[in-house]
Amino acid sequence: SLCVKTPQEAKGVDLLIVAVKYGSLEGSLDAIEQIVDDETIVMSVMNGVDSEEIIGHRIGMQHMMYSMIKIASERTGNCVRFNPEVTEGVYFGEADGSLSWRVAAIENLFNDSGVRFHISEDILKKIWAKYALNISMNLPQAIIGCGLGGYRDSAYVMDISTKLKDEVVAVALAVGIDIREEKAAGFDSRTVSPKARFSTLQDLDAKRHTEVDMFSGVLLRLGKQFGIPTPYNALALDIIKALEEKNDGRFDYQ
């Protein structure tokens, strides 16, 4: 059975892991603030590149341990399915790459938990590389409504993916993070079905709102801040927002 506590009952935990959908993060900040005390470490395993700053702005960045999770899953209703044998798991580390006592404490906890994990001395680059992967592989698929095989079988789908990723790489460089040498994403047709659908398309299929604000929305804001054009991500944001409105019945006239 699950052990569920109110924020007040959980006050002062050693480690708090934040794993909510992006649209629910702002609404979770009050609870996070109530749980955290002076010694609490907070890990956000959410996608995107700004959840740590959003949380840290409320509770103080000294609490934050940068982290991300790599897991291929499929959500149906309230059920999430994944293959633990091929799941990479949690990556975490200090922003400065140091192997601090906090890193050692989390490692000690995870060693006894069965959680798959990796300690990273370059966690910010890993977070941005995953961000580029999500934008370049999640969004074209969601716009076109195709399985993963579209990237292999259509030069046009792959071109959209490449142009979206190029914008992420340019913004990352402006922020001070170089992901140019990160390998392009691909898939092994022997182990991954060309019918596979990533989370944004899964959300649209189920008529749920997506996390496109966390992907292209944040990139547009950062691009504007640093003077980097992001036209492909601007179009992707508009298209996916329009698909959300269509799913909501706002203009579906069939």
Language-model regions, residue ranges each:
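Rossmann-like NAD(P)(H) cofactor-binding subdomain of soluble oxidoreductases
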Residues: 1-81
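NAD(P)-dependent Rossmann-like dehydrogenase/reductase catalytic/cofactor-binding core
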Residues: 162-254
